């Protein structure tokens, strides 16, 4: 049997895996157990009551968190003409067309989000095998293929998170940093859950938000009592 690290022993002593914690208690636990030498992210896992094998029950989208994610997001935009100018004014870090595509092909991808205007997809479409596996391929479902590139850039910079269930029907995303206040983490989590409720597939039956757990980058998951959250859309 693998030997438990001191950190894992402390987590096992502190976190009762059989219970759901009131949100402020859950956040206090995360902060207490976050002992890494860097500011850890606060991540969330949401178990959805969907059948992920059925395409009409998959959940995918994006929402802007009220307090952002605590990360400085670099945005690349494929656009030309007026759209390119609008993207630059909105704060895009890199804007281009064929020249930007060449950078991507060389592996020069110093950005976290890619946005494209619809007319630029003829160029972006050739980059699917590079951008796709990295989760960077623009998609209209999450608002990154849009005629309003300026708004997409502002959303990304403001702390928009993109979500998509995995094959087990679980959503994984980041909702902040461990140095956020408990109220900021709570409000970000609530905003995400409201967005997920709105994205509920019509064919999904029974309980939808089955389990919500929060964790830090290096920590264990703490289940949250949804009754202590305000998720009325």
From Swiss-Prot:
Listed GO MF terms: rRNA binding; structural constituent of ribosome; tRNA binding
Family matches, as InterPro entries: Ribosom_uL1_bac-type (IPR005878), Ribosomal_uL1 (IPR002143), Ribosomal_uL1-like (IPR023674), Ribosomal_uL1/biogenesis (IPR028364), Ribosomal_uL1_3-a/b-sand (IPR016095), Ribosomal_uL1_CS (IPR023673)
SUPFAM superfamilies: Ribosomal protein L1
GO CC field: cytosolic large ribosomal subunit
Residue stretches in coiled coil: none
Any Gene Ontology biological process: translation
Keywords: Repressor, Ribonucleoprotein, Ribosomal protein, RNA-binding, rRNA-binding, Translation regulation, tRNA-binding
Pfam families recorded: Ribosomal_L1 (PF00687)
Keyword field contains Ribosomal protein: yes
PANTHER family, per the entry: 54S RIBOSOMAL PROTEIN L1, MITOCHONDRIAL, LARGE RIBOSOMAL SUBUNIT PROTEIN UL1M
Function: Binds directly to 23S rRNA. The L1 stalk is quite mobile in the ribosome, and is involved in E site tRNA release.
Family: Belongs to the universal ribosomal protein uL1 family.
Binding partners and assembly: Part of the 50S ribosomal subunit.
Name of the protein described by the UniProt record: Large ribosomal subunit protein uL1
């Amino acid at each position: 049997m693998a030997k438990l690290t001191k950190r894992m022993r402390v987590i096992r002593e502190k976190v009762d895996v059989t219970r759901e914690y009131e949100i402020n208690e859950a956040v206090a636990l995360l902060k207490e157990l976050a002992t890494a030498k860097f500011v850890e992210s606060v991540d969330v896992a949401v178990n959805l009551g969907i059948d992920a094998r059925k395409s009409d029950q998959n959940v995918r989208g994006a929402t802007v968190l009220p307090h952002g994610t605590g990360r400085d997001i670099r945005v690349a935009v494929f656009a030309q003409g007026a759209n390119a100018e609008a993207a630059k004014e909105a704060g895009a870090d890199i804007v281009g067309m064929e020249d930007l595509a060449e950078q991507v092909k060389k592996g020069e991808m110093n950005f976290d989000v890619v946005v494209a205007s619809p007319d630029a997809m003829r160029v972006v479409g050739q980059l699917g095998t590079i951008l796709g596996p990295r989760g960077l391929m623009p998609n209209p479902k999450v608002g990154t293929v849009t005629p309003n590139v300026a708004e997409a850039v502002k959303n990304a910079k403001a702390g928009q998170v993109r979500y998509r269930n995995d094959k087990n029907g679980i959503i994984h995303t980041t909702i902040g940093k461990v140095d956020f206040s408990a109220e900021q983490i709570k409000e970000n989590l609530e905003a995400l859950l409201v967005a997920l409720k709105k994205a509920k597939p019509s064919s999904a039956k029974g309980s939808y938000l089955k389990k919500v757990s929060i964790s830090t980058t290096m920590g264990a998951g703490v289940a949250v009592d949804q009754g202590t959250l305000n998720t009325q859309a």
